[in-house]
Design a protein with these regions (language model features):
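A short beta-strand-turn-helix
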Residues: 21-39, 68
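Short active-site neighborhood of thiol/selenol oxidoreductases, capturing the structured segment around
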Residues: 35-49, 74
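Typically the conserved alpha-helix immediately C-terminal to a functionally engaged Cys/Sec
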Residues: 52-69
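Structural microenvironment flanking redox-active thiols in thiol-disulfide oxidoreductases
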Residues: 67-87
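C-type cytochrome heme c attachment motif
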Residues: 46-53, 124-127
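Bacterial Sec-dependent N-terminal signal peptides
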Residues: 1-20
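Non-globular targeting/processing and membrane-anchoring segments
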Residues: 119, 130, 136-182
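Structural micro-motif
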Residues: 38, 93-102, 111-127
């Protein structure tokens, strides 16, 4: 009887503690060919405090985890790291990347070419691609779960195609039905 109670408690305690299924950009592009889905790339730097906060708070929110996993291939990309990306017939690297480098606030001036070509200049930055790996848009800056939710939804539902002005965006936000309770 104690075993049953223990196992039941263990199962109940593990429900809802999922994680975002982070994969590499190359893996996301490969998966997208088999099962089309939008891609969310979370660009970060190891020294970035707001990136860590977003990873430890925003991306730990259960509603955000579920929404991201259901609607996107999620890529966590170290913009100053050495990951090699094959994208649109080109290879992107960080030619001056040194895995033994000292990590210091403000970076070391060595950015991955993939981040550069997408115009990523600050961290964190989220970049979104459609189901055919075409760039949709990017959103720089830290977002709390409730702040991030409408950005995810506007991309996932293709509502972004209807938003042309700041007024359109403000109307979208005003009418947005939040699931995140914070």
């Amino acid at each position: 009887m104690r075993k049953i109670v223990f196992v039941t408690c263990l199962l109940i305690s593990s429900i809802g503690f999922g994680q975002i299924k982070w994969i590499t950009m190359n893996k996301a592009l490969e998966e997208q060919k088999k099962e089309p889905k939008k891609i969310l790339v979370h660009f970060f730097a190891q020294w970035c405090g707001l990136c860590k906060r977003m990873e430890n708070q925003t991306y730990q929110n259960q509603e955000i985890i579920k929404y991201v996993n259901d609607n996107f291939y999620a890529v966590k990309f170290d913009a100053e790291g050495g990951e090699k990306v094959e994208f649109n017939g080109r290879t992107f690297t960080n030619p001056t990347y040194d895995p033994n480098r000292e990590i210091k606030y403000g970076g070391n001036g060595s950015r991955n070419q993939f981040a550069d070509v997408l115009g990523v200049r600050s961290y964190p930055t989220m970049v979104f691609f459609d189901e055919k790996a075409n760039l949709i848009t990017s959103f720089p800056g830290y977002r709390k779960p409730k702040e991030l939710e409408p950005y995810l939804a506007v991309i996932a539902t293709d509502e972004y195609q209807k938003i042309r002005t700041q007024e359109d965006w403000e109307k979208y936000i005003k009418n947005f039905n939040h699931q995140v309770k914070e």
